Amino acid sequence: MEDFLLYSLYTILALLVPLYLYLLTRKPKFNKSKLPPGNIGWPVLGENVDFARGGPRKFIEERMSKYSSQVFKTSFMGEKVSVFCGPAGNKFLFSNEDKAVTSWLPRSMRKALLFPSYVDVPMKEVGALQHSFLHEILKPEALKKYIPVMDAMARKHLDAEWAPFEEVKVYHLAKKYTFALACRLFLNIEDPEHVKRLADPFARVMNGLFSIPLDFPGTAYNGAIKGGNKVREELLKIVTNRKKELVEDESSAGRDLLSRMILVKDEDGKLMNEMEICNNIVGLLVASFDTTSCAVTFVLKNLLELPHIYEKVYQGKLIV
């Protein structure tokens, strides 16, 4: 048995080593377009290892210093990318959406987040209706309706998860709160156990989403793939059940984002199917899981480190 395993290992190495050497030594075919300075790293691995080892800040600062403070090229998750830095880069990106640039995600990320039949569909088509919904739910009139819910959930969360303890992990608890709030506002889900059925696999997705895209058992990326399958399975059940509820009782429409997504029609009068709705919901949940949680964590960190700012915020809260 040991001889067989050893022979199998030698066979695999004999096949993989020449392929790796070929990828390492071949001359890439570049087009005539001028590319920014930088390095795309190792074949397949790209610069994922350096990114994971040093963290985002160190990784970006080193390359800004070495190559350019405005833009540099690198390779993440099997994709060659350009990283824009500073105000000029941000202005260019955000003022040229659907003009000079378009929304895009690496294929490895799409594979973890979307249904298989949508992995190769342009992101513009996958989230075609999301922008109109975002504008709708972020309008001042809409935000007024959310504030009582957000306030009540925040108080309940602080009483249960913060008050009983002398020390807490802010980032972890911020993610727990913002994800539960997203489930409440987007899906009208309040049951903690139901939220947990979505949060646990979603955490696996986020933990492996930016890892090296090797889909082998035991890798972080494989965990992201499995977590994504579970999230989509759970969301599909929620969407299907909500559709049945709306058929039986149309008066329940409009109480949350999901209900409006089910009923909205595109320019051709066509409704979104269940998988399209799930894809859009996943995009919103991704934003709620990390981005908002990071903002909350840094706000609390700065208030702790700057007591004079904290005092002004506190006094302002008392006035309100």
Where are the regions a protein language model picked out?
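Cytochrome P450
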Residues: 1-18, 75-82, 140-152, 161-184, ...
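Conserved cytochrome P450 catalytic core segment spanning the I/J/K helices
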Residues: 139-142, 227-296
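N-terminal membrane-proximal hinge/A-helix region immediately C-terminal to the signal-anchor transmembrane segment
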Residues: 2-116, 125, 129, 144, ...
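Helix-loop "lid/cap" segments that line or gate small-molecule binding pockets
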Residues: 114-123, 185-189
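Hydrophobic, repeat-rich solenoid/adaptor surfaces of innate immune receptors and signaling proteins
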Residues: 84-87, 157, 185-186, 238-239, ...
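Alpha-helical membrane-targeting segments
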Residues: 42-51, 207-226
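Cytochrome P450 catalytic-core helices
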Residues: 291-310, 314-316
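Conserved, non-catalytic sequence blocks in retroelement Pol enzymes and Pol-derived host proteins
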Residues: 31-37, 51-53, 120-123, 138-145, ...
